[in-house]
């Protein structure tokens, strides 16, 4: 999420007192750099990342500065070499491509526009890579993930510099519950989304935040400064993350997590 998306978040919320205490643990989280991904000259940053279990590829969504060009790269998860790419000029449908998630049940990626229309989630058929008709939600959506264990979707929406709303949707995109949590952060910037068995992970500019299925913040772990973790996903029991750092796009692994995630 960059400044253009932050500027687009215009809703003002009354923040209630949290019903449950935050149970966070501050500890550094090690990230191991695996590779730099070379980008085409028409794009300059990544915003979405996920794992396609059908193709066995990482999928990286990259954009240009004004959200008019998008490239989706497929990456071999072993060699970390680009094996395919798909180019778009779809500001109205794809826009910022803020987060990317894969639903293996219907073989579709989902991304959020976040700049032209902050209420839409756009599907992309994962074999043809055709962009489909957007899904309009009643709530704003910026960080979006599919929970395959529960066949649900999770959306993390910034409220203030510290507070976030976590919205949960069924497989037909009907909202089923909402939690408001304190990410203990001092910036509205919010990145990434991962969901598994009711648990949710997202990042701020400096931390990973883990929330359980009852809306309790179980862990907040810092990561190395000077990088921006944009999105993350699991493959074979290990988490991987796409990072913007010093004008480069890099893939990192997280060999251990300080909390249990069913992935």
Residue ranges and their predicted role:
Residues 182-211:
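Loop/turn-rich, solvent-exposed surfaces of beta-rich toroidal or solenoidal domains
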């Amino acid at each position: 999420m960059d400044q253009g998306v932050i500027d687009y978040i215009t809703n003002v919320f009354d923040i209630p007192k949290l019903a449950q205490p935050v149970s966070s643990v501050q500890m550094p989280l090690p990230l191991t750099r695996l590779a730099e991904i070379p980008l085409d000259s028409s794009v300059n940053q990544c915003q979405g990342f996920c794992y396609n279990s059908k193709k066995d590829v990482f999928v990286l969504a990259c954009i240009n500065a004004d959200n008019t060009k998008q490239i989706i790269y497929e990456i071999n998860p072993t060699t970390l070499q680009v094996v395919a790419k798909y180019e778009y000029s779809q500001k109205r449908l794809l826009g910022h491509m803020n987060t990317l998630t894969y639903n293996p049940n219907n073989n579709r990626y989902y991304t959020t526009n976040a700049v032209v229309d902050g209420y839409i989630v756009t599907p992309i058929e994962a074999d043809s890579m055709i962009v489909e008709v957007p899904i309009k939600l009643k709530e704003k959506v910026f960080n979006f993930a599919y929970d395959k264990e529960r066949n649900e979707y999770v959306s993390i929406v910034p409220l203030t510099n510290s507070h976030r709303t976590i919205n949960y949707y069924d497989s037909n995109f009907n909202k089923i519950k909402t939690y408001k949590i304190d990410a203990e952060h001092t910036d509205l910037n919010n990145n990434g989304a991962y969901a598994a068995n009711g648990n949710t992970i997202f990042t701020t500019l400096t931390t990973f935040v883990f929330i359980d299925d009852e809306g309790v913040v179980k862990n907040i772990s810092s990561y190395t400064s000077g990088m921006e973790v944009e999105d993350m996903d699991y493959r074979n029991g290990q988490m991987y993350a796409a990072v913007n750092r010093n004008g480069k796009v890099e893939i990192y692994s997280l060999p251990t997590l300080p909390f249990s995630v069913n992935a």
